[in-house]
A protein has these predicted regions:
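N-terminal Rossmann-like dinucleotide-binding module
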Residues: 1-49
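Alpha-helical elements of Rossmann-like donor-binding domains used by nucleotide-donor carbohydrate transfer enzymes
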Residues: 17, 43, 60, 69, ...
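Short, conserved SAM-binding/catalytic segment
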Residues: 43-51, 108, 112-115
Length: 171
């Protein structure tokens, strides 16, 4: 089997993080980037080992039929609309969190993906980071006892600057 072909929709901060992670895999390659923000595309190219095809709209990417896996890393409120088109491909999907931004879209997601033949995964890649993976292993082994509660405080600026400040003043 050849390399798994990834298409990344949204080449901002999270899209670039996925590119860097895909670069660590032996049998995987990014074959396409999709973003209407040219500066984000150019930044993503710096992390790539190859020269992928570039698309400004996800429907054009879908029509090209070049990917085995689609990663949706666009502004949160756009995930459901892109997903409605992407599910026609029956390819594997990785969708950045949050999957949806309202309850209505969650129910719609459940309805349109019922029986979907590909793998659908909401990105929770931190669980594979070595410190987190070790922590999970320790919990599962019982070495710290029966866990009752767990709390994490994240020490970073919560609203990174994004294209058009979509994460600060969005729908």
């Amino acid at each position: 089997m050849g390399a798994l072909k990834y298409a990344i929709i949204g080449s901002g901060t999270m899209g670039r993080e996925h590119i860097r992670n895909i670069n660590l895999l032996k049998n995987a390659e990014v074959v396409a980037l999709c973003d209407d923000h040219e500066a984000s595309i150019e930044e993503s190219r710096k992390d790539l080992k190859n020269n992928p095809r570039i698309f400004s709209h996800h429907n054009d990417l879908i029509e090209a039929k070049i990917a085995d896996v689609y990663i949706i890393a666009t502004p949160n409120f756009t995930h459901i609309d892109i997903l409605k088109d992407i599910i026609k491909t029956k390819a594997h999907l990785l969708i950045e969190k949050p999957l949806c931004t309202n309850v209505k879209d969650c129910f719609h997601f459940k309805k349109i993906t019922k029986g979907y033949p590909g793998i659908i995964w909401t990105a929770m890649e931190y669980r594979y980071m070595p410190p987190v993976a070790k922590f999970i292993k320790e919990i599962q082994s019982g070495t710290i006892g029966d866990l009752k509660m767990f709390s994490i405080r994240e020490h970073r600026f919560p609203f990174l600057i994004k294209v058009n400040d979509w994460n600060r003043f969005s729908k």
